[in-house]
Structures are given as C-alpha cells and as structure tokens.
C-alpha cells in the first residue's frame, strides 16, 4: 500500500514495512520526522523518539495535530499515507532543482517513438550537402526531380522500402508459376485462315492484356505514393507548418 512512496523516500525496507507492528510503526514515525518532515526542532523531538513510553500514543496524536493531519491516531493507515504524502512533497520542495529536469521514462519513450516515426522532420533542407545527396540518390534511382528536396527524399524512401529491401528483392526474384490457359475459351474476333496464326494471335492478345493489367497496377501504386507525399503536412508547406 505504501511501497511506492516509501521507495521514493529511500526508506530502508519499502516492501517489508508492517504498520501493524507497533515497534516498527513507532520507529518509522521517528524516521519520517527526523529525516523527511522535520516539523519539530531537533530538541523538541524527544517525546516522539521515546518509542517505549506508555505516553507515546498521546505524543503521536499531538504530532498529527501539529502537522495538520486530518486523520486521528485510530486511522493508522490513512494517517501514514497522509504523512508519506507530506514527506514526498517536502522532499521534492527541498530538491526541486535536482528533480526539475527529470523526464518520466514513458514520456521519453513517447518522444523517441515520435522522432523515430518521422525521421525527416529534423533535417536541414537548406543544407547544400543535403541537397547534393538527395539529387545524387534521385539520379541513381531515376526519380523525377522536384523543387522540394524533402519531397524527393520521401519518394526515395518509399521506393527503397517497396523495391530495395531484402524482402522486396526476394519477392521480386521468386519465379512465378504460370497457370494453364485454355485458348479455345478466348474468342479472337477474327480469322487469319491459319489455325497456327490464330493460336499465336490469341497468345499475343493474352500477353498484351497481362501487360496492361501490370501497367494499371503500377499506375495505381504511383498515384497512391504521390498522394501520400503531397498530402502530408510535414512535406508540403502549403498544407501546414513543418513538423505539425
């Protein structure tokens, strides 16, 4: 119940603290006042430190009132939790300069993930070396030139991801197994007067249809790729500020 706050306060046994053990509980209160809260002056802590006194509960009840704790001595767990919260606040206040620059791990991970998700955001597009490198890659990969070098770079990245990765190359190198085609089911529409020529014409027509389908697929892919580039506010300054 108290482990996280005890850990934050560097308590020696945060996982094993037993508030129901009277001796351990009283020692804990003394430690909390001496090391973290420090509400009393050192010379005024004698009664609280005398944990074996039969009057200790009375002194502890007075202590709760002095620190303005809203809970009574009978509400032990609630009082402990409140005192721990007070100690944490005081600890942070004493060490504000130490903790102010700390960033939670989950926030660091989120920031890193955002940077990794869009690595083009922080590039200096006006750097001459950057422009020369992009132009060299575009020429090498035969990519159409564009006034915006960031647009060209994104086009290069898309091409590399889709065509030049290990998986893409392996897929392209796979031998495609053809399917048997019944030529008699495909009507030619004219007759050459020669059965062999008719069959050759049917084959040429089927090959032409296949080429047209592949061309249409490539055109569709190109349209999607271009739309992804020009519709991205990060690469099209007309659609918004860079990085937004």
From Swiss-Prot:
Residues annotated with N6-acetyllysine modification: 20, 62, 98
An example Gene Ontology biological process: negative regulation of protein kinase activity
Highest taxon of source: Eukaryota
GO molecular function terms noted in the UniProt entry: identical protein binding; RNA binding; RNA polymerase II complex binding
GO CC list: centrosome; cytoplasm; cytosol; mitotic spindle; nucleoplasm; nucleus; perinuclear region of cytoplasm; tRNA-splicing ligase complex
Keywords: Acetylation, Cytoplasm, Cytoskeleton, Nucleus, RNA-binding, Transcription, Transcription regulation
Function: RNA-binding protein involved in modulation of mRNA transcription by Polymerase II. Component of the tRNA-splicing ligase complex and is required for tRNA ligation. May be required for RNA transport.
Protein name, UniProt field: RNA transcription, translation and transport factor protein
Organism expressing this protein natively: Mus musculus
Origin organism lineage: Eukaryota, Metazoa, Chordata, Craniata, Vertebrata
